[in-house]
């Protein structure tokens, strides 16, 4: 392993998801819209190359990663490498099937659980990722085994009325951390009943967007102290959107506020038309492997720095990692 770099590799191992959330897009976090899953052999090859290039932090996402048959084996594989950490983004679908392996490596793993509301329906809109009794039981089982859990809450005009109560339930009753996220501006969304694209997608974003400043007074009231810029251990400061954090007892609430702007590389500022047109919001903060084996920066739509790793040998994969890691410096 080369000198460790202070970032992570996110991997969308599948585009399959058991839920269809209105604010998500086809393919989930992957840039691919196809229904596909990375083979275990391919994902192992990429992880080994990432580790050899200094990446020891990994985020497993999708789609819904726990739906993939090799999910447990994947955790075991990553843990074979020294000093690795794994973050798992899930809606809890099959997470308890892997409780043994998660408990085995609990010091190096954290679960990011998507929970957006207290109610299943708000204003007639379905919220599949709500705080159901099943979600509560899964959370308690994970915490009983000392596994770190964080609830990710995507805030919109629809669920804003429930967010404050949800935050306090999460922290005080379930002993989990929380991250509040404002709504990403995509060119397409799954929508309430049908997919929306182009102007319809932009109009939906405008109608639903809630500024995080709506919550700052509340967070100050319930916290003992705060930091204006704070990160978890997977990335360092001065990358992407600066995120504040509010501490309450042993737990915390992190806030992703896109109105604070983001940090970009020199390449972005000088060469990227998408950056110059204001079409990139998240900045540069991590690497991402999409389900079609294309390696890119997280959230980056500039295909001139997308690297197709299908059928590539180790030397070619290493060059791709080096090129993207240079943009993070």
Where in the sequence are the language-model features?
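Secreted/processed peptides and extracellular or luminal domains of membrane proteins
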Residues: 23, 27-30, 210-212, 274-278, ...
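Radical SAM enzyme [4Fe-4S]-AdoMet core and its adjacent flexible, acidic
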Residues: 120-267
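Radical SAM/AdoMet-radical enzyme domain recognition
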Residues: 40-60, 68-181
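Canonical Radical SAM [4Fe-4S] cluster-binding loop centered on the CxxxCxxC motif
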Residues: 2-41, 53, 297-299
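Conserved beta-strand segments that form the floor/walls of ligand-binding pockets within enzyme
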Residues: 8, 12, 59, 150, ...
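Flexible mid-to-C-terminal extensions adjoining Fe-S/redox cofactors in radical SAM and related proteins
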Residues: 263-329
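Flexible, acidic/Gly-rich N-terminal and inter-domain linker regions that tether
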Residues: 1-7, 19-23, 217-236, 290-296, ...
């Amino acid at each position: 392993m080369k000198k460790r770099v202070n970032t992570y590799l996110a991997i969308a191992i599948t585009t399959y998801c058991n839920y269809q959330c209105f604010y998500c897009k086809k393919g989930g976090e992957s840039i691919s819209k196809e229904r596909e899953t990375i083979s275990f052999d391919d994902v192992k090859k990429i992880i080994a190359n990432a580790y050899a290039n200094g990446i020891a932090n990994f985020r497993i996402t999708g789609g819904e990663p726990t739906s993939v048959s090799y999910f447990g084996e994947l955790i075991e594989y990553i843990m074979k490498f020294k000093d690795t950490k794994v973050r798992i983004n899930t809606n809890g679908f099959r997470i308890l099937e892997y409780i043994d392996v998660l408990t085995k490596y609990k010091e190096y793993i954290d679960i990011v659980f998507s929970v957006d509301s207290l109610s299943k329906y708000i204003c007639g809109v379905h919220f599949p990722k709500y705080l159901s009794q099943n979600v509560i039981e899964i959370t308690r089982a994970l915490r009983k085994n000392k596994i770190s859990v964080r609830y990710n809450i995507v805030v919109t005009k629809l669920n804003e009325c429930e967010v404050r109560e949800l935050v306090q339930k999460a922290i005080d009753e379930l002993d989990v951390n929380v991250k509040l996220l404002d709504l990403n501006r995509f060119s397409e969304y799954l929508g309430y009943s049908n997919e929306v694209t182009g102007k319809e997608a932009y109009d939906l974003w405008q109608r639903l967007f809630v500024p995080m400043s709506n919550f700052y007074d509340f967070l100050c009231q319930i916290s003992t102290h705060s930091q204006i810029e704070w990160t978890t251990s997977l990335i360092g400061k001065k990358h992407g959107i600066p995120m504040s954090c509010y501490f309450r007892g042993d737990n915390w609430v992190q806030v992703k506020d896109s109105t604070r702007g983001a940090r970009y590389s020199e390449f972005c500022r000088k060469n990227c038309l998408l950056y110059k047109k204001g079409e990139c919001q998240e900045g540069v903060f991590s690497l991402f492997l999409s389900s079609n084996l294309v390696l890119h920066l997280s959230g980056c739509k500039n295909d001139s720095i997308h690297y197709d790793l299908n059928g590539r040998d180790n030397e070619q994969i290493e060059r791709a990692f080096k090129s993207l890691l240079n943009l993070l410096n």
